[in-house]
Amino acid sequence: PANEIKKLFNSDNKVTLFQSAIGPQKKNVEMHVSKRKDSSSILPIGNRQASIFPGTEESHKEKIKIGPLNQFLSKKDFKKQVFVKIDVQGYELDVLKGCEDLIHLFDFIYVECSFIELYEGQVLAHEIIEYLNIRSFILDGIYNTYHDKSGIAVQSDFLFKKI
C-alpha cells in the first residue's frame, strides 16, 4: 500500500509522506501482513477476524518503523482545523498515545473501533471512548457499523469532537 499512496500523492506539494507507523515509542516492530490490504496490523490477527472477514489471514510479517507523531510533525505544522483519521486494526490506543503531545491541537478524531476482539490484545471501543473523554473529546457520531452474520455489532467508525 505504501507504493500506491506514494503514486497517488507524488505530485502534490501540499502532502508530505512519512513511511512509519505512529505509536508511543520509537522502535522497529513486526507488521502482521494480511492477505487483504486493509486488514494488516501491528497486532497478531485473531481467529475471530479471520472467521468474520474471510481472506484476512496473515500472509507474512514485515519490519516497520514506529514512533510518536511529534517525531514527524510539530505544533507549527497545525495551522487550521485538524481532523485525524485512525484505522489501524486494533492498534488505536497506541496510536492515540503516540499523539499525546499534540492531541490537544486536534479538533476531530475519526477512529474505527471494535466491540469484540479481532486482533490479539486490542483494546475495545469503550476503552477508546474513555481515553478520549479524559482528553476532552466527546463522541459526536457513530457510523458504518458492521454486524456479523448473527447480527452482533463487530465494529464502527466513531467521530470525536474536541470540547
What are these regions (language model features)?
Residues 47-59:
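Short glycine/proline- and acidic residue-enriched helix-loop micro-motifs
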Residues 30-32, 65, 159-162:
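Short, well-ordered beta-strand micro-motif
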Residues 2-3, 40, 93-97:
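Alpha-helical elements of the RecA-like P-loop NTPase motor core of helicases
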Residues 72-163:
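Conserved acidic-Pro-Pro-aromatic motif
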Residues 1-37, 44-49, 117-119:
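SAM cofactor-binding core of SAM-dependent methyltransferases
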Residues 11-16, 59-60, 80:
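A short helix-to-beta-strand connector/capping loop
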Residues 18-20, 63-66, 85:
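Conserved residues in the N-terminal Rossmann fold of short-chain dehydrogenase/reductase
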